[in-house]
Every structure is written in structure tokens, then in C-alpha cells.
Amino acid sequence: MTAWILLPVSLSAFSITGIWTVYAMAVMNHHVCPVENWSYNESCPPDPAEQGGPKTCCTLDDVPLISKCGSYPPESCLFSLIGNMGAFMVALICLLRYGQLLEQSRHSWVNTTALITGCTNAAGLLVVGNFQVDHARSLHYVGAGVAFPAGLLFVCLHCALSYQGATAPLDLAVAYLRSVLAVIAFITLVLSGVFFVHESSQLQHGAALCEWVCVIDILIFYGTFSYEFGAVSSDTLVAALQPTPGRACKSSGSSSTSTHLNCAPESIAMI
């Protein structure tokens, strides 16, 4: 077991705790309304409630979407930090898992596509975290439009890879868990998108709740990689970064595969 096992768990714990902290700050600063509030008005008078308590009158501008919670300081600063740190950790997890599957001689287009979608998800998170929806709406929506579909595709691809590589009952149990998480992510993401395009306050609030469930669900999915990351080593990262031709080369005098580019002349002649 290596310290890498803590990386996926840290991503889940740090990000989930962080976004709920951002939400709490936004509610206390009257920037959004609580998730339990389903009553919205067309307009509101100045809120007489003191800072530190939730708003007593809400409009559609106060729907507690995750992005909306991180739109204004001071919570926007924490939101950007979470987005940046989360994006880095997501990219690192994707790269390590890609290299780990290569070490197991599981070379497939699914693994490569999963790496691409995971890194695309990370890039989208960077944009979402640094361009707040109320200040750079177009860029924020572009980032969200990249991050959410890419994250969902990454989840689905790794469900397939989990079933493909299952050799023990516990492997199958993890694959089942990931399948359940993938289904939940798909349903909530679709519902969130469908509800979000409507002007109804009830549907807008429903979109916010679905978005929260979807994001937390995907973060939990990333956390499940701790199951495999106990076997990750520094060589795993080397395997992920190794040029493709070198992975199939064998060192002289050995029957085992080497990560060094010590190929036979016949292989070089084919290039």
C-alpha cells in the first residue's frame, strides 16, 4: 500500500467539504437562499434580516446553484481555490489510473479516451472556478458545458474498465458501486439541464438540487479509485508519460517488458 491511496479520498473530502462551506458562506452573506427554500418571489424589498442569517425573501437570482454560491466574495475566493486544487487532483488521478492500466497491459482506446475526458473535465473545472457566473457568464457556461459532459463520460468509461478488469469478488463489488454512481450522475445531470432551461422557480430550484447531487456523486466516484491506488508507485506515472513505442519494447537478456526504449532493430526499422 502506498500514500497514493489518499489522493482520491482527499479529492472527495476536500471538494465536498469545500463546496458546502462555500454554500454556507453564501447563505450567511445573503447571496443565495437555502436549499430547503422552495418559495420564490418576482421581487423583494430590502432584506431586514441581519447578516449571519438566511434571506427571508428570495427571487430567481437567489437559487442556490453551486456556481451561484461562488459568485461573490468572500466565498468566490474559496470557490476558485477549490476549482483549481480540484482540477489538479482530477488530472493527476486520471493520469495515474491511465498509467496503472498500462502497467497491467490493458492497452485500449477506452483507457486512452478516459484519460482525455478526465483531463478535459479538469480543464472545464479550471474555467468554472475562475470565471464566476455573475461576472463572466459566457466563459463560465462554456466551462460548465465542458466539465459536466466530460466528467460523466469519464465515469461511464471507467465503469466499463472496472468490469473489464474485475478478477475478484471485491473487484465486481466496486464495479457495481461505480455503475450505481454512474446511473445517478447521468439521471441528475440530465434532469438538471432540463429543469435549468425553464423559468419556473420550482424547476430552477430542482435544477440546483440535481446539480448538487450530480457533483457530489461524481466526486464520490473519484474517491473509489482509492481501491486501486494502493498499488500505484512512481513507476506508474512513468508508464503514463512513456512514449507509446517504448511500452512494448523488451530489454536485452530479459523476457520482461521494460519502460526503456531498448527496442530490437526490427522494431526500429518499422518506424
Swiss-Prot record:
Q: So which stretches are on the Cytoplasmic side?
A: 1-2, 97-108, 162-178, 233-271
The record's annotation in Pfam families points to:
Frag1 (PF10277)
Top-rank lineage group of the source organism? Eukaryota
Q: Which PANTHER family match?
A: FASTING-INDUCIBLE INTEGRAL MEMBRANE PROTEIN TM6P1-RELATED, TRANSMEMBRANE PROTEIN 150A
Sequence similarity: Belongs to the DRAM/TMEM150 family.
Provide the function of this protein. Regulates localization of phosphatidylinositol 4-kinase (PI4K) to the plasma membrane, possibly by reducing the association of TTC7 (TTC7A or TTC7B) with the PI4K complex. Acts as a regulator of phosphatidylinositol 4-phosphate (PtdIns(4)P) synthesis. May also play a role in fasting-induced catabolism.
Protein name stated in the entry = Transmembrane protein 150A
Look up and give the organism this protein is from.
Homo sapiens (Human)
Q: What is the lineage of its organism?
A: Eukaryota, Metazoa, Chordata, Craniata, Vertebrata
Q: Which gene encodes it?
A: TMEM150A
